[in-house]
Amino acid sequence: PSSIERVPVDVEAANGMLWAFDALYLGVNNYNDHTKSGLYRLTDTIGDDQLDKVELLRQISARGDHGVHAVRLSPDGKSLFLITGNNTEPTEFSDSRVNTNWGEDHLLPRMPDGRGHNRDRLAPAGIIYQVDPDGQNFEVYSHGYRNIFDAAFNADGELFTYDADMEYDFNTPWYRP
């Protein structure tokens, strides 16, 4: 049987958790100003099986529920993937697999949400980053999402995700594979 144990650290609002590289990685989205949004690493520094050290590897500006989300292990087990929604500002990155000349690329004139929801959110929107285990090098893996919360790799190492989109939005998405 499994048991649940409270981790004795002062971190809130973890939307994603991953155990890798002898550490617990957290994708944290700040809802209440207690814990900064970003990628965290929790480790056991004295060998007592208790996570006692909290490191904010990268602070990421995010707001609302479309912020920093899941953390996934790469198929080769050498890096992390951080999933972020469209209320997350792009963080500094060292490289990109996709073009970074962000644009709206709408086929028809822009039609912002009539109710005012996220009218100011433009491309690149949500981004999937590939990140080294120390959180120093961020590479844009894919971007253009609205509110992706998680992703998964298949047996061939292909990444799949689902975008929680505004079902009544008639514009084309920002997707960039």
Model-predicted segments: where are they?
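Beta-propeller domains with acidic blade repeats across secreted/periplasmic ectodomains
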Residues: 1-177
